[in-house]
């Protein structure tokens, strides 16, 4: 009886620890989203981010840095908190998201709100296969089958559920992230991890090619590629 009691207690302790760790991961984003953003402070905090992501938050065509302009507030916040806590392995970002560098929860709230107001690059990096090609059509079919239920029919994502906006993201960046996830160098949600047992590398290339060609609403775009963030002139 004592052995059974000890085993039950041990199992309950494990369940409590697992639940607590999951709650701890979710709770900060709920707390931070309660703050009222200060866009002026967000602009100042963004100076740290602009060193890599550029003042326009457009990132790089080669996929080194993503376009973060126009991304959902909840998505940006989740990514920053995941990197800060170590849930997401990103050594290049790790030093810049710590409290000693960018500040506390209020500062995070401010900077993600500021980023979300920036217009997107009207000429982001796209994949090699144009609409009408066999690869494009294959990518569209796979996207509808595996991705659209979370990321939306047009790649618009979902702010409330923290599903990233994919439309407008650089093709080379998405390919790099897919390879990191495939090689288990980036932690991803189980529903995403299951795709790597279903889809081939060629499938992923075609899906991401299709995503990179999804149109971004004109209202979310900068007027042209010559646009420069007026806050950084």
Language-model-detected regions and their locations in the chain:
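Disulfide-stabilized extracellular ectodomain repeats and their linkers
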Residues: 46-49, 65, 73, 144, ...
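N-terminal signal peptide c-region/cleavage motif recognized by signal peptidases
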Residues: 20-21
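Bacterial N-terminal signal peptides that target proteins for export
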Residues: 2-12
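The canonical Cys-X-X-Cys-His
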Residues: 42, 47-55, 111, 115, ...
């Amino acid at each position: 009886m004592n052995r059974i009691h000890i085993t039950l207690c041990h199992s309950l302790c494990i369940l409590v620890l697992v639940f607590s760790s999951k709650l701890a991961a979710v709770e900060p984003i709920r707390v931070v989203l309660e703050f009222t953003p200060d866009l002026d402070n967000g602009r100042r905090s963004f100076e740290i981010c602009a060193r890599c992501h550029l003042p326009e938050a457009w990132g790089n065509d080669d996929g080194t840095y993503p376009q973060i302009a126009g991304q959902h507030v909840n998505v940006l916040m989740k990514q920053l908190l995941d990197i800060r806590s170590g849930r997401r392995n990103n050594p290049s970002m790790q030093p810049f998201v710590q409290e000693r560098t960018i500040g506390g929860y209020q500062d995070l709230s401010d900077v993600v709100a500021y980023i979300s107001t920036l217009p997107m690059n009207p000429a982001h990096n796209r994949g090699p296969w144009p609409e009408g090609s066999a690869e494009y059509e294959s990518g569209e079919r796979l996207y509808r089958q595996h991705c659209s239920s979370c990321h939306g029919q047009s790649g618009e994502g979902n702010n409330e559920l923290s599903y990233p906006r994919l439309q407008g993201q650089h093709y080379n960046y998405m390919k790099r992230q897919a390879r990191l996830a495939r090689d288990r160098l980036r932690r991803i949600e189980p529903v995403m991890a299951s795709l790597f047992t279903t889809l081939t590398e060629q499938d992923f290339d075609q899906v991401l090619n299709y995503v990179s060609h999804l149109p971004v609403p004109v209202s979310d775009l900068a007027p042209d590629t010559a646009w420069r963030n007026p806050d950084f002139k």
